[in-house]
C-alpha cells in the first residue's frame, strides 16, 4: 500500500476515565500504520507537567508522533458558583482561578461589573493606581514562578531557588497590603478593599531597590548558560501563523515578534499614562519566551516605580467610589492583632444611625443591583489575554460569568509545539507556555 493509499489516522478525543479507550484506539492505530508506536500517559501526577495536566503522547522511539492534552482534573465549578453569590462576593471566587495571578482575575471581574454599572470613569484615581501596582508586582511574581518551575523541570535547581526566593519578597508586600499572601480578594467593584497601610510604600521602595540586582543574578545564571540554551533554543517552535490560527496570546505570541499587549492596544486602569515598552523577540521558541519574561519583569519594575510616585502624591485620597448605594466599606485596616480598626469601624456603623445600619446590612447581605446587559472585558495577564464575558439579568447576582483564560487557550499549542520533537522537549514546550491548571479547569 502506498502512502497515498493509507487510511487516515484516527483522531481520539480524550476526557477523564477513558484510558481503556485510548489504549484500544492506539493499538488499532498501530496496527494500521507501519512502525512501532506506543502511547505514553504523562501525568496528571507528574513533576514536570505544571500541575494536574495530562499529556497523551503517541511516540515512535523517542519521537512524538501525536500529542494531546487531557484537562479537567482541577475543575472547581467557580463560574457556576458565581451565579449563587452577589456581585461583590464573586471576587473571593475568581481570585482562586489562576492562583498565581489573582489580582488579574479580580481586576478583570471588577472592570466588567463597573462597566455594567456605568461607573468606569468614576473609579478614584488612587484606586486605579493601586490596582496597577498590585498587578505589576503580581506579574513579576508570576514570571518568577514560571522561570523557577521551568528551571526545575530542566534540572536547573539554582533557578528554582532564586525564583522562589525573590517571589517571597513580593508575597510579603501582598501580605502587608491585603493581609494575605495569595487569594487576596483585595480589588472590589468600585475600587479596592482598603487603602495602603503606612508601612506599605517603604516596603515597596525597598523591594524596588533589591529586585533589579536579584533579576540580574538570574540573568547571569541562565542567559548564556550553554545547557540552558541547548535545552530551550529551537524547542517548542511556534511562529506567528500558528499563534494566529490557535488564538495564542501573551509571551508565546510576543516571541514571534508581534508587539500585542492589551495594556497598549486596549488600555485600562490608566495604563496609557504609564511609560513602559512592550517586549518582543523573533526566535519563536522557548528561549525567546524566557527572554521576554525576564525583560517584562524589568518593565513591570518601571511601572511600579511610577505607581509609587503617584501614590506618594495622593495620600489620603479616596480608594472607593462615593456612591453609598454601590460602595462597600473601604476604610478597614488590618492590624498586628488581626483586627486593626475593625472594632471602631463596626461601632461607627452601628452607632451612626439605625437607617445607616439597615442600609449597611442590606448592602452586604443582598448586594448591589447591576443593570441588565452583557460585557466583555480583557486584561493582559502574565500568560496572555484574560477576558471576562459577563451577563446580568438586573439582579443582585451574576446570570453568567465566563472567563477566557489564556492558559486554556494556549494549551492548544501543545500539539503544534511537540509533534515531531523529542519526548524530553515536550517538558520544555509546556514550561514555555506556563499554564496554570487552576485557570484552565476553573
Curated annotation (Swiss-Prot):
Keywords: Cell membrane, Membrane, NAD, Quinone, Translocase, Transport
Membrane topology designation: Peripheral membrane protein
Reactions performed catalytically: a quinone + NADH + 5 H(+)(in) = a quinol + NAD(+) + 4 H(+)(out)
MF terms (GO), sorted A to Z: NAD binding; NADH:ubiquinone reductase (non-electrogenic) activity; quinone binding
GO CC terms in record: plasma membrane
Name of this protein: NADH-quinone oxidoreductase subunit D
Main location: membrane
Amino acid at each position: 500500500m502506498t502512502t497515498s493509499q493509507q487510511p487516515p489516522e484516527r483522531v481520539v478525543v480524550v476526557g477523564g476515565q477513558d484510558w481503556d479507550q485510548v489504549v484500544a484506539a492506539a493499538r488499532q492505530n498501530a496496527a494500521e500504520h507501519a512502525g512501532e508506536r506506543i502511547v505514553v500517559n504523562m501525568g496528571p501526577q507528574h513533576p514536570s507537567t505544571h500541575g494536574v495536566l495530562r499529556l497523551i503522547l503517541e511516540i515512535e522511539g523517542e519521537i512524538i508522533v501525536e500529542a494531546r492534552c487531557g484537562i479537567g482534573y482541577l475543575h472547581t465549578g467557580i463560574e457556576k458558583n458565581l451565579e449563587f453569590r452577589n456581585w461583590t462576593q464573586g471576587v473571593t471566587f475568581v481570585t482562586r482561578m489562576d492562583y498565581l495571578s489573582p489580582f488579574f482575575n479580580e481586576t478583570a471581574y471588577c472592570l466588567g461589573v463597573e462597566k455594567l454599572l456605568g461607573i468606569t470613569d468614576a473609579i478614584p484615581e488612587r484606586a486605579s493606581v493601586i490596582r496597577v501596582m498590585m498587578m505589576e508586582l503580581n506579574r513579576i511574581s508570576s514570571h518568577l514562578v514560571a522561570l523557577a518551575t521551568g528551571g526545575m523541570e530542566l534540572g536547573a535547581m539554582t533557578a528554582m531557588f532564586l525564583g522562589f526566593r525573590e517571589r517571597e519578597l513580593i508575597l510579603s508586600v501582598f501580605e502587608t497590603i491585603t493581609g494575605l499572601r495569595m487569594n487576596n480578594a483585595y480589588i472590589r467593584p468600585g475600587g479596592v478593599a482598603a487603602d495602603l497601610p503606612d508601612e506599605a510604600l517603604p516596603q515597596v521602595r525597598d523591594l524596588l531597590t533589591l529586585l533589579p540586582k536579584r533579576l540580574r543574578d538570574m540573568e547571569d545564571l541562565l542567559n548564556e548558560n550553554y545547557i540552558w540554551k541547548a535545552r530551550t533554543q529551537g524547542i517548542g517552535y511556534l511562529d506567528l501563523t500558528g499563534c494566529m490560527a490557535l488564538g495564542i496570546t501573551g509571551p508565546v505570541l510576543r516571541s514571534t515578534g508581534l508587539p500585542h499587549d492589551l495594556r497598549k492596544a486596549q488600555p485600562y486602569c490608566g495604563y496609557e499614562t504609564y511609560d513602559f515598552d512592550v517586549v518582543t523577540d523573533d526566535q519563536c521558541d522557548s528561549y525567546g519566551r524566557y527572554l521576554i519574561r525576564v525583560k517584562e519583569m524589568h518593565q513591570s519594575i518601571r511601572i511600579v516605580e511610577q505607581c509609587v510616585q503617584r501614590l506618594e502624591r495622593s495620600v489620603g485620597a479616596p480608594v472607593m467610589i462615593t456612591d453609598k448605594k454601590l460602595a462597600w466599606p473601604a476604610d478597614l485596616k488590618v492590624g498586628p492583632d488581626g483586627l486593626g480598626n475593625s472594632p471602631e469601624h463596626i461601632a461607627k456603623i452601628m452607632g451612626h444611625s439605625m437607617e445607616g445600619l439597615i442600609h449597611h446590612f442590606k448592602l452586604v447581605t443582598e448586594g448591589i443591583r447591576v443593570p441588565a446587559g452583557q460585557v466583555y472585558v480583557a486584561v493582559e495577564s502574565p500568560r496572555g489575554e484574560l477576558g471576562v464575558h459577563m451577563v446580568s439579568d438586573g439582579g443582585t447576582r451574576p446570570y453568567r460569568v465566563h472567563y477566557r483564560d489564556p492558559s486554556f487557550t494556549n494549551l492548544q499549542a501543545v500539539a503544534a509545539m511537540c509533534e515531531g520533537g523529542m519526548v524530553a522537549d515536550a517538558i520544555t514546550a509546556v514550561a514555555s507556555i506556563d499554564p496554570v491548571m487552576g485557570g484552565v479547569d476553573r
